[in-house]
Amino acid sequence: MGVNAVHWFRKGLRLHDNPALKECIQGADTIRCVYILDPWFAGSSNVGINRWRFLLQCLEDLDANLRKLNSRLFVIRGQPADVFPRLFKEWNITKLSIEYDSEPFGKERDAAIKKLATEAGVEVIVRISHTLYDLDKIIELNGGQPPLTYKRFQTLVSKMEPLEMPADTITSDVIGKCMTPLSDDHDEKYGVPSLEELGFDTDGLSSAVWPGGETEALTRLERHLERKAWVANFERPRMNANSLLASPTGLSPYLRFGCLSCRLFYFKLTDLYKKVKKNSSPPLSLYGQLLWREFFYTAATNNPRFDKMEGNPICVQIPWDKNPEALAKWAEGRTGFPWIDAIMTQLRQEGWIHHLARHAVACFLTRGDLWISWEEGMKVFEELLLDADWSINAGSWMWLSCSSFFQQFFHCYCPVGFGRRTDPNGDYIRRYLPVLRGFPAKYIYDPWNAPEGIQKVAKCLIGVNYPKPMVNHAEASRLNIERMKQIYQQLSRYRGLGLLASVPSNSNGNGGLMGYAPGENVPSCSSSGNGGLMGYAPGENVPSCSGGNCSQGSGILHYAHGDSQQTHSLKQGRSSAGTGLSSGKRPSQEEDAQSVGPKVQRQSSN
């Protein structure tokens, strides 16, 4: 009997740097590449049409690339535990290969399939290629626990063995004499389904802003590396109105689905840096997005409750409000704040928003205005975001809601000033909220302040054609800051508000709240497309807020919180350079004292 092999695709939807597939082919007489799709899951899961379309395009591209090698992709309907025992017998399988899945659900699923394979006498090959590192080795190096600060994570990574080079791309030379048995009715039996077949209504569906697939991913990678301004100094470009739109060099959805190898990206960045900088060693900051991705994966890998508040040992238990009506307004872009509504509209239409836009809407939903649980926001992102990833999505929402990782709760994003600072003319608002197109720039971020005559000229009456603001931001955010202060005062490890809530950690970095050490960088994305990490990059300017109504060129409210004060008063904001956030680093103690010190005159909330 010959050696009949199967490679099971899940993530890792590519032929480049696919070590499990490459090893599976070696010594095999036949190879079949399968993707198992559960049609019932498509109709019942919390995944929107844009993500499904992206996945199906990835599968179509993978099938097209396999065709060039005289092979095909086998898309099989069903559940893995039901499908594999049948395939093992029907195809006389002797070898199965998979890419290692670090997430708890994936590990549980794969353990069950390995058991079935062993019982059937099938050899199982598992190789790591969705992450840069073996996460278990990082945890082992840290005394058996995941590192809970990024600084500790960086220390551990610096002690790891150098990364292996990406595996050779699967070509006809790699496949050699290994062939794929194909039948005439392959498309009927194993073809990639359409959205309609999965039960989606595609009427009115606009064309994809982010086309799925490995071919597109590699094209974007080359574009990304060719950008002259970025290549020249390896700094991210300045934030402007165009930054809010989908970029042809964005990579985050492709890393999420494994159309692009993180290892290939890593080494391409390294090679380019050495070429431009004349062989000098690249700093860790060059790999910002990739390393933060690894950090969240490491934090989540042994925590099946990572996406929950209850039962999650690293999450602060905050008594969030339950308000389905308010949640729906936020999710559907009906808050009455054009900046928030435009972001949520772009997300629903295109499946992607800039990481600073993610900051704004996450803060608004949770600690900023609505006081609704981060779990609800995470579910909406899971449905709509192309690059939503279980570990990174949950980690980002915990972080932005000040539930874990980072407790800078006295900074609050203004839903008026933040957008105005980024896009003063309001072009972004007009693009995604055409109902407001007629408003002049002066009022487009706060149209409720426009005189009735201007509203009539704009053909948009606030409260009739566009909703009034659902909350008073100045009042709501002040109340929520006070709530957060009281919650953190109750935490046993809390050390006061004078510093940026640096939660103490023990020698192996396992502080209970994943607090950052002073001077440590907060999560950042590289310029690769602003993926699910939602972080600031070093050197990036972040708008600051000036005053309670946030109506003039403002972005972040800075609250003073003297110990004797029950209600926190607003502090006049300074320029973005005045806060530690502008550099992506924690402020020093001196800077922080300036930003949030108690010596602040009380202001009216009117």
Curated annotation (Swiss-Prot):
Changing residue 247 to D: Reduced inhibition of CLOCK-BMAL1-mediated transcriptional activity. It holds the Pfam family FAD_binding_7. Its cofactor is FAD; (6R)-5,10-methylene-5,6,7,8-tetrahydrofolate. Transmembrane segments: none annotated. A motif (LIR 3) lies at residues 151-156. Induction: Oscillates diurnally, rhythmic expression in the early night is critical for clock function (at protein level). In SCN, exhibits circadian rhythm expression with highest levels during the light phase at CT10. No detectable expression after 8 hours in the dark. Circadian oscillations also observed in liver, skeletal muscle and cerebellum, but not in testis. GO terms for molecular function: DNA-binding transcription factor binding; double-stranded DNA binding; E-box binding; histone deacetylase binding; kinase binding; nuclear receptor binding; nucleotide binding; phosphatase binding. Expressed in cones, amacrine cells, and retinal ganglion cells of the retina (at protein level). Expressed in all tissues examined including heart, brain, spleen, lung, liver, skeletal muscle, kidney and testis. Higher levels in brain, liver and testis. In the retina, highly expressed in the ganglion cell layer (GCL) and in the inner nuclear layer (INL). Evenly distributed in central and peripheral retina. In the brain, highly expressed in the suprachiasmatic nucleus (SCN). Disruption phenotype: Mice show an advanced phase shift (around 4 hours) in the expression of DBP, NR1D1 and PER1 genes in the liver. Double knockouts of CRY1 and CRY2 show slightly decrease body weight and lose the cycling rhythmicity of feeding behavior, energy expenditure and glucocorticoids expression. Glucose homeostasis is severely disrupted and animals exhibit elevated blood glucose in response to acute feeding after an overnight fast as well as severely impaired glucose clearance in a glucose tolerance test. Residues 3-132 form the Photolyase/cryptochrome alpha/beta domain. A motif (LIR 2) lies at residues 82-87. Its main location: cytoplasm. Changing residue 290 to A: No effect on its interaction with MAP1LC3B and moderate decrease in its autophagy-mediated degradation. The modification Phosphoserine is found at residues 71, 247, 280, 588. Binds 1 FAD per subunit. Only a minority of the protein molecules contain bound FAD. Contrary to the situation in photolyases, the FAD is bound in a shallow, surface-exposed pocket. Binds 1 5,10-methenyltetrahydrofolate (MTHF) non-covalently per subunit. Transcriptional repressor which forms a core component of the circadian clock. The circadian clock, an internal time-keeping system, regulates various physiological processes through the generation of approximately 24 hour circadian rhythms in gene expression, which are translated into rhythms in metabolism and behavior. It is derived from the Latin roots 'circa' (about) and 'diem' (day) and acts as an important regulator of a wide array of physiological functions including metabolism, sleep, body temperature, blood pressure, endocrine, immune, cardiovascular, and renal function. Belongs to the DNA photolyase class-1 family. This is Cryptochrome-1. The gene is Cry1.
